[in-house]
C-alpha cells in the first residue's frame, strides 16, 4: 500500500457471537499491542454494539453491519444511522455481498444507504465485488464500475469521500477458502484507483483506501498487504479467531 494512506483492517463478525464469546474476543483485542499506523474496526451484530463499544479501547472503531436509508419511521426490523451514533459507534458497513445476494439489495438501495449514512455523520465501508460467473465471463471491471457509479452519483464532495473506505470483495472468495492472488487483488485495486481518478473529485484517488475482503487469513495477509493499492482488509471468519490480531499486524 501507499505510505500516505493509513492501513485499515475491519473485522466483520456477521451473525456470530454471544456475550460470553464477545468477552473473549474483546479481551484478546485489548491485550494486543497494535501499531499506531493501522486503523482497526469491529463490526458487531446490532444487539451487541453498545456493549462492544463500551468494552473496546476507543482507538478501535465499532461499526454496524447495515442500516437503512431514512432517519426513522415504520420500517420494522431496520435501524438508522442516528441510532448507531446514539450508542457511540461511528462506522457502518454497507453493500456487503451477503446483503446484495441474500436480501436482494440493489445498487441503488446501497447507494441511498451510503448517502444517508454520510449525511448523518457516519463513516462507511462500502462493499463492491463480482461473482465467480461474472469473473469467468470477464465482467469484473464492469460489475465494480456499475456498483461504484451508483455510489459516486450520491457523493458530491471530497469531504464525504474522506469518510468512505471501499472494500473490494470478490464474492467467489468469501467464506470459500479461495482467495484472490496478490496479483489478482492488485490488478483490480489498481483499476479501481484509476477509476476514482477519472470519476471523482481531484485527489480522491490517492487518499481513498481500497481494502480487500475474501478469505483473508494470517497465512496470506502479509503478501496481500505488500501490494501497492491494497490498503487493508475486511475480514470475516478469521475476525472471530486469534489470528485476527496477526492480520491487524500485517503491515508491521
From Swiss-Prot:
One of its GO terms (molecular function) is triose-phosphate isomerase activity. GO terms for biological process: gluconeogenesis; glyceraldehyde-3-phosphate biosynthetic process; glycerol catabolic process; glycolytic process. Keywords: Gluconeogenesis, Glycolysis, Isomerase. It is an enzyme of class 5 (isomerase). It catalyses: D-glyceraldehyde 3-phosphate = dihydroxyacetone phosphate. The active site is at residues 96, 169. Its EC number is 5.3.1.1. The keyword Isomerase applies. Pathway: Carbohydrate biosynthesis; gluconeogenesis; Carbohydrate degradation; glycolysis; D-glyceraldehyde 3-phosphate from glycerone phosphate: step 1/1. GO terms for cellular component: cytosol. Substrate binds at residues 12, 14. InterPro entries: Aldolase_TIM, TIM_sf, TrioseP_Isoase_bac/euk, Triosephosphate_isomerase, Triosephosphate_isomerase_AS. Homodimer. PANTHER family: TRIOSEPHOSPHATE ISOMERASE. HAMAP family: TIM_B. Belongs to the triosephosphate isomerase family. This is Triosephosphate isomerase.
